[in-house]
Structure formats: C-alpha cells, structure tokens
Amino acid sequence: HEDALIVPEQPDKYNILTDDPSDPTQHFIYQFYQKYQTVIITNPTEADYKFNFTANNGIKITAPEQKQEIIDEGIEFLQKVLLNLYSDSFLKKNLPFSILLSEEVRMASYGETTIMNCYASSSFIALGNVSSSLETMTDEEFVKIRADVNASFWAKYMSEVRGLFTISDAFYEASEEVEPKLYDPNWYRFKGTDPNEIDFYKYGVITYSENSYIDEDWPDFNSIYAPLKSEDLAQWMNFVFEKTPAEIQEICDKYPVMKKKYDVIREAMLENGFDLSKLEL
C-alpha cells in the first residue's frame, strides 16, 4: 500500500509471515496478509495509530486483553462485522495497510471523549469492542455496531480519506422537493412534540437532529429539528447497513423520497464495486 506509513522496525513485527495451521487465528492472519497485503494487528501500540501522516489524530486505543480466546473471538467478530459483507476483489482494492483490533477506541475532541465502534484513517481501520463482552453481546447490539462500523468505513475511509465515495446533491434535493426548508441553516422544526408521532420517512430522513430538545417529562416544550445535511447522510449510512434489503425495499415502496435517496447511495457504492441491494445481513 502506497499510503502505508508504519514500516515495521523488525522484519516480522506483527508475526504475519509465520503460518501455523494448528492455530486458526494465526493461520487466518497469515493468509489474510498473503491475500490482501493488509496486516491484522491484535495487540496495537501507540506507534500503530498515534499519527496520521504528521497530524496527531487524537485517538487513544486500548489493546484487547491478550488471551487466546478473546483474540480468536475478535477475529471472528471482524469477519462478521465487516469483512464478510464484501467480495474478495472489493477487499483487495480497498483495505488499508492495517486493521487494529481494539478493546476500546476513544476520540478526544474539544474536551469531550467519545467511545467509537470504529475509526478510520489513511493507513488503518481500528475496530473496537474486542473484549470478553463479545460473548454476551446481544443480536440487537451486534446489528447496531455492524451498521456503525460499515457506515464509518464508507463515510470516513472511502469518502473522506480516499475520496472514492461521493454523494451527489440529488440526495438532498429529493428531501427539498418534499420540504424546501428542510436544511434551512436556521433549523427546520417539525410540527409536533412527540418524535414517535412524526413520520420522518415522509421527508426522506431517518430521524431528528441531535440538536433537538426532547424532555419526556415536559413534552410540550420539545423542539424537534430536521437533521443537518451531514447528520442526514450519517444517519442514512447507518440505516442502509442496519436494515435488511427486504426491509428497505418495503420502506422505499411506501415512500418514493426514501427510494430516491437510497438509490443515490446505492449508485455511489456501485461505482466502487459494491452492490448494496445484494447485501446479506
């Protein structure tokens, strides 16, 4: 990979050149590197992630507990949550230099710390949640994390880092045809105070803006705002990986504006060799 930044100090720092067929995880890591030239790092240190080219990227990664069963489960989790969704040719073309298995990925920004399911930079993707709690993760939690990881992969890595995935204005124009002021810089406020009673799909959006004011005890004072363009796209990216194609089809049949926006995302992904409508979740 041309953007590979971290050159191992010793010939096989990450133990990727040694095959051990009796150890399924080591065998997988070895084969994965042979096939994709991508290093799976199971015990990341600061040197593996601290700097993104020359800028400090502001993240702190906690390596997984180095117990065999946790690393084994982490590899399985990586496959289920990301790798299995894509074809070999797509992965060969689009994986970064390394994938970091992490117990926790924290991002510090403006004095606030966010725990992330996934972080993408020019040379690596860090996957969080690799811990003993994988054993007790519910299906519902898994679906949400998988959606978030893939949304992050496309929005951050494929779009921001590599510039390969771009969404045309038609995406936002579809919603503006329904409500011209939806993305008003002064905030478009939905009529109604109960978010459960607002038909967001009618506007082509998934839900309300995180800048909304919602108090369950005093619903009359609620202010429910439409998402900003950036929020709208981020919510959609999670949505297309959280719902099955059949569920999305049903929603698109009922709401033409949802179909228009889904098609814009699908077309942009098709240009990168991935067919969202054939996604198997």
Please report, for each region that a protein language model flagged, where it lies by residue.
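Acidic/polar, low-complexity intrinsically disordered N-terminal segments immediately downstream
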Residues: 1-88, 251-281
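Auxiliary, metal-adjacent structural segments of Zn-dependent hydrolase domains
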Residues: 68-123
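Solvent-exposed, polar/charged alpha-helical surfaces in well-ordered, non-transmembrane soluble domains
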Residues: 72-80, 147-152, 203, 235-238, ...
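Structural recognition of the beta-strand scaffold that forms the well-ordered cores
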Residues: 100, 125-128, 234-235
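Active-site scaffold of zinc-dependent metalloenzymes
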Residues: 104-149
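Catalytic Zn2+-binding segment of zinc metalloproteases
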Residues: 140-172
